[in-house]
Structures are given as structure tokens and as C-alpha cells.
Amino acid sequence: MNERHLTGAASEMLVAYKFTKAGYTVYYPMLTQSKEDLVVCKDGKFSKVQVKTATTVQTNTGDAKQVRLGGCGRSEYKDGDFDILAVVVDEDVLIFTWDEVKGKTSMCVGKRNKGIKL
């Protein structure tokens, strides 16, 4: 298995753990290549979660953490694909709603886009 797949699997497990600690029930889709990586439920409300791992990129002002959300040969996400984007930044998980990321093909996270820490 390649390093990227291992990192992605570890990120999904970290996000599932953090949601569980926050009182959610976590479900896994049967198909591994679905648009949602997890489904979470709390108080009867279900949400589809897409998990991404932030990578370090060089910018004019120093290092930044970035996630790719499509484009450059990859299909872009559309309405209904997921409700929550969970971004793993080192050991932290930042949560963004679909409305916050809709239409983006990449975004820097942390300093610019803080999200909600899970």
C-alpha cells in the first residue's frame, strides 16, 4: 500500500476517534471510493463527512497547510456529496461545512481558514 493511502486511512481513523469522543456515532460506508468517508450521527442528525489530510506547501510568507478539493484532473465535489469537511492538520481536526468549501478546488487551512476544532 502506498504512503498516501496509509496517511489517508490514519486520518480517517483520527477523525472517527475525535467524533466518537465528541459524542457522535460513527458509521463507515461499504464502498471505499464513495464521496463520503464517514457518516456521523448525533441527536438523530446524520451528516456525511469527507476527510482530507493537509499537506505543507511553500508560500511567499512561509509554510502553509493546504488541502485539495478537486480540479487538476480530479472530479470536483458537488452539492450533496458531503455535509462536513474534516481536515487533519498534524494531530488536530478542523471542521468546515459544505457551504464554507463549496466551489473551491483547494484551500489553505489553519491561519486563514480556522474552521472549528473537533
From Swiss-Prot:
Single GO MF descriptor: nucleic acid binding
Gene3D superfamilies: 3.40.1350.10
Pfam families referenced in this protein's UniProt entry, alphabetically: PDDEXK_5
Protein name, entry field: Protein 5.3
Protein's organism: Escherichia phage T7 (Bacteriophage T7)
